[in-house]
C-alpha cells in the first residue's frame, strides 16, 4: 500500500467548488449552458482516459509481476482520478437527468418553458413601483459587499499577521479583483436578466461562508503551523480566497447598472451608485456597531445571508412566476442555513483548525482583534489575531520583564505597568514593597478572561485601567503640569502622578498603533511622570548571540530613540532584549542587586544567571548598535518600518519591484487606452481613497 494518503476530500471539494462556480456563471448568463457542458464533458473524458490508462498499466504490472518503481505513485493517481471521474459523472448525469426521466414517462411529450425575463416585461407595474423595486438590487449588492468586507477583513487580519501592510494588501486585492469582475461583464455578450442577477446576488451571500471556512482550513495546510506568512504568501493567499466573491461583486455591479439603465430607459449609473452606497452605509452601521459585538463571524455571515435573501424575496415577488417560485426555495434554504449556523457552534469548531494540538477554551472578537485562549498540558495560551501574547506560568519571561528593571532601584513608590496584568508580570511587581501598581490594558476583554481563569492578583495595591496607554500618560502629564504650575507646595497631589518605574510589556512595533508607544515623543511624556533617576523599561525580540542586519537596525533605532530622552541606556539580553533607560545609573549585574534586596525569584538569581556573562553579552550588543540609526518619531515611524522589514526578512528578501513595476505598466497601458471620463473617474477614486488612508 502507498504511504501517500488519497486526496478524496480535497479533490471532492475542488470539484464541487469549481462546478458550483461554473453553474453560477451559467445561471447568471456569463457563459452558456453549452459551454459549461463542453468543459465538464472534456474533463470527464480526460478523467476516464487517465484513470483507465493507469488502471490498465497497473493490471499488467500485477498480472505479469513486473517490478515498477513508481507503482505506489501510480496507484495514488489512479484512485485520485477515479474520485474525480465519479464526481464529474454525477455532474454529467445531472445535466441529462431529464432524458432519463422521460424514459419512465408514459408520453414522450415534454413541456418546456424557456420563459426569460427581459427588459420590457414590467408592463403590469407602474413606473414608480418598478423603479423602487429595481433600486433594491444595488442596495442588496452594496449591503452584502460591505457587510462581507467588514466581517472578512477582521478574519484575514486574524490569520495573516494583522498590521497595516496586511490591511493594504487585502484591500488592494479586493479593489483590483472587483474591478476585474466589472471588466469581465463588458466581455459578456448576453444581456443581463433578472433571474441571473437575483441568482448572482444570492450567491454573493453564500460565497463568504465558503471563503471563511477555506481561510481557516487552508492556513495550516499551505503554511507550517506557527509560521509567519510572507508578503508574497499574503498576496497570493488573499487573492485566491477573495477572487470568487470580488469577481462576482464587480460583475454584478456592472450588470445591475446596465439592467437598470435598460429597464428605466435612462442612464442609471448614478442611481446604481447611490443605492449601492446606501446599502453599504446601512451594512457599515449594522456590522460595526451591533453585529460584531454580539455575534461571531459565521453567525454574522448567516445574518447577512438572511437579510440579503429577504431583500431578494421582496424583489422577486413582483417578478414573473418562474423567478418568484425559485426564490421561495432560495429564501427557505437561506433561512434554514442561517438559523442552523446561528444555533450550531461552527466558529469554535472551524477556529480549531488554526490551533492543532490545543484545546480552545474561550474566544472573542473585540474591537482590537480576535482574542483566543487555548489550553495544552495545563498551560493557558493567549493569542491576539493568531499571534501569541503570553502563556501562563512562564516564569522566565515574567521575572526578566520585571526584575531586570526594578532591581536597579529600591522601589517603594508607584510603578506603572503597560500590559501584563494577568500574564504573571503584575505578580512579580507586587513582590516589591511598592505603594501602588497601576496597570493599563487596552482590551477590557483581557480582564474578563483574567477573572474567568482566576489570573488576577488579589492585592489592594493593584489598580487596573482600561484604555490607550498613550492617552492615559498624556492626561497624567497634563495634570502634573497644572499642579506644578501652582505657587504652593503640591507634593501630596503629585504622588499619584509620579512613578519610580514604567514597564512597557507590549508587543513589538509591528503596527502604527503600537509604534506610538515606542516613539521619542511618548518616551518624553513618560519621563515627565518619572521621579528623579526613575527608569523606563521596554523589550524587543531576542537576538541571542548573533544579530542580523535587519535585527541590528531595529535594535539600534530603539536604542537611539531612548538615548534622545534619557542619559543612560543599557540592553540586557534574555528571552528578549530588555532596554532600560534612566538618568541615573544602570547595570546588567542584576543577580548581585537581587541578593542585596532579598526578592524571592526562581530564575533571576545567582543560581541561574551569571553577572559577568550578562555584562559581556550586553556589551557585545551595545558595541554593535549604530550611533547613526534614525530616531523613531510620531511623524516618522522608523521603528514600525524597521520592524516590518525585520518580519519580511524571515521569508527572504522580497523584491518589491517585481510587484510595483507590472502594476505601473498596467496603469500606463490602461491610461493610454482609457477615455477622458475614465481617467477622471480613476483620478477621483485614487484621491478619495488616499484621503481615507491618511
Describe these PLM feature segments:
Residues 1-128:
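Membrane-embedded alpha-helical bundles that constitute the cytochrome b-like, heme-associated redox core
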Amino acid at each position: 500500500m502507498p504511504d501517500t494518503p488519497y486526496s478524496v476530500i480535497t479533490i471532492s471539494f475542488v470539484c464541487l467548488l469549481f462546478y458550483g462556480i461554473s453553474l453560477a456563471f451559467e445561471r447568471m448568463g456569463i457563459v452558456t449552458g453549452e459551454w459549461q457542458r463542453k468543459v465538464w464533458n472534456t474533463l470527464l473524458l480526460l478523467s476516464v482516459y487517465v484513470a483507465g490508462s493507469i488502471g490498465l498499466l497497473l493490471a499488467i504490472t500485477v498480472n505479469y509481476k513486473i517490478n515498477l518503481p513508481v507503482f505506489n505513485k501510480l496507484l495514488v493517481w489512479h484512485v485520485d482520478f477515479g474520485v474525480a471521474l465519479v464526481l464529474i459523472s454525477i455532474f454529467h448525469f445531472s445535466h441529462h437527468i431529464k432524458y432519463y426521466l422521460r424514459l419512465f414517462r408514459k408520453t414522450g411529450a415534454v413541456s418546456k418553458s424557456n420563459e426569460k425575463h427581459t427588459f420590457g416585461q414590467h408592463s403590469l407595474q407602474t413606473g414608480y413601483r418598478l423603479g423602487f423595486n429595481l433600486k433594491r438590487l444595488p442596495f442588496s449588492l452594496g449591503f452584502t459587499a460591505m457587510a462581507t468586507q467588514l466581517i472578512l477583513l477582521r478574519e484575514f487580519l486574524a490569520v495573516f499577521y494583522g498590521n497595516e501592510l496586511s490591511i493594504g494588501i487585502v484591500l488592494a486585492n479586493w479593489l483590483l479583483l472587483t474591478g476585474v469582475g466589472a471588466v469581465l461583464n463588458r466581455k459578456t455578450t448576453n444581456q443581463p436578466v433578472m433571474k441571473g442577477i437575483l441568482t448572482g446576488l444570492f450567491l454573493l451571500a453564500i460565497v463568504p461562508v465558503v471563503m471563511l471556512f477555506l481561510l481557516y482550513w487552508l492556513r495550516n495546510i499551505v503554511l507550517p503551523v506557527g509560521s509567519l506568512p510572507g508578503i508574497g504568501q499574503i498576496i497570493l493567499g488573499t487573492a485566491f480566497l477573495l477572487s470568487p466573491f470580488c469577481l462576482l461583486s464587480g460583475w454584478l455591479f456592472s450588470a445591475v447598472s446596465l439592467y437598470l439603465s435598460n429597464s428605466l430607459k435612462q442612464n442609471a449609473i448614478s442611481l446604481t451608485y447611490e443605492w449601492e452606497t446606501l446599502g453599504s452605509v446601512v451594512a457599515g452601521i449594522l456590522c460595526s456597531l451591533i453585529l460584531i459585538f454580539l455575534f461571531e463571524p459565521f453567525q454574522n455571515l448567516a445574518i447577512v445571508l438572511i437579510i440579503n435573501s429577504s431583500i431578494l424575496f421582496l424583489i422577486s415577488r413582483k417578478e414573473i412566476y418562474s423567478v418568484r417560485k425559485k426564490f421561495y426555495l432560495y429564501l427557505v434554504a437561506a433561512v434554514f442555513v442561517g438559523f442552523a449556523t446561528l444555533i450550531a457552534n461552527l466558529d469554535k469548531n472551524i477556529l480549531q483548525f488554526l490551533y492543532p494540538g490545543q484545546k480552545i477554551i474561550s474566544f472573542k472578537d473585540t474591537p482590537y482583534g480576535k482574542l483566543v485562549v487555548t489550553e495544552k498540558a495545563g498551560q493557558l495560551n493567549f493569542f491576539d489575531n493568531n499571534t501569541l501574547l503570553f502563556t501562563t506560568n512562564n516564569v522566565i519571561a515574567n521575572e526578566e520583564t520585571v526584575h531586570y528593571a526594578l532591581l536597579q532601584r529600591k522601589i517603594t513608590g508607584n510603578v506603572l505597568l503597560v500590559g501584563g496584568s494577568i500574564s504573571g508580570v503584575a505578580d512579580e511587581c507586587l513582590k516589591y514593597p511598592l505603594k501602588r501598581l497601576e496597570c493599563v490594558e487596552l482590551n477590557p476583554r483581557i480582564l474578563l478572561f483574567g477573572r474567568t481563569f482566576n489570573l488576577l492578583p488579589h492585592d489592594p495595591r493593584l489598580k487596573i485601567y482600561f484604555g490607550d496607554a498613550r492617552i492615559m500618560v498624556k492626561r497624567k502629564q497634563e495634570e502634573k503640569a497644572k499642579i506644578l504650575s501652582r505657587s504652593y507646595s503640591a507634593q501630596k497631589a503629585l504622588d499619584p502622578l509620579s512613578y519610580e518605574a514604567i514597564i512597557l510589556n507590549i508587543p513589538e512595533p509591528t503596527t502604527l498603533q503600537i509604534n506610538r508607544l515606542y516613539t521619542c515623543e511618548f518616551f518624553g511624556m513618560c519621563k515627565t511622570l518619572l521621579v528623579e533617576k526613575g527608569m523606563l523599561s521596554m523589550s524587543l525580540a531576542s537576538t541571542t548571540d548573533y544579530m542580523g542586519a535587519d535585527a541590528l537596525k531595529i535594535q539600534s533605532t530603539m536604542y537611539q530613540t531612548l538615548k534622545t530622552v534619557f542619559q543612560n541606556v543599557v540592553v540586557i539580553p534574555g528571552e528578549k532584549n530588555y532596554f532600560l533607560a534612566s538618568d541615573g545609573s544602570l547595570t546588567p549585574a542584576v543577580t548581585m542587586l537581587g541578593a542585596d534586596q532579598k526578592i524571592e525569584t526562581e530564575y533571576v538569581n545567582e543560581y541561574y544567571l551569571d553577572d559577568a556573562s550578562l555584562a559581556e553579552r550586553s556589551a557585545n550588543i551595545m558595541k554593535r548598535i549604530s550611533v547613526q540609526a534614525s530616531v523613531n518619531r510620531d511623524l516618522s515611524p522608523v521603528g514600525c518600518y524597521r520592524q516590518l522589514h525585520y518580519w519580511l526578512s524571515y521569508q527572504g528578501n522580497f523584491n518589491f519591484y517585481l510587484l510595483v513595476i507590472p502594476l505601473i505598466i498596467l496603469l500606463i497601458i490602461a491610461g493610454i487606452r482609457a477615455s477622458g471620463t475614465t481617467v477622471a473617474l480613476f483620478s477621483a477614486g485614487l484621491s478619495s481613497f488616499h484621503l481615507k488612508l491618511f
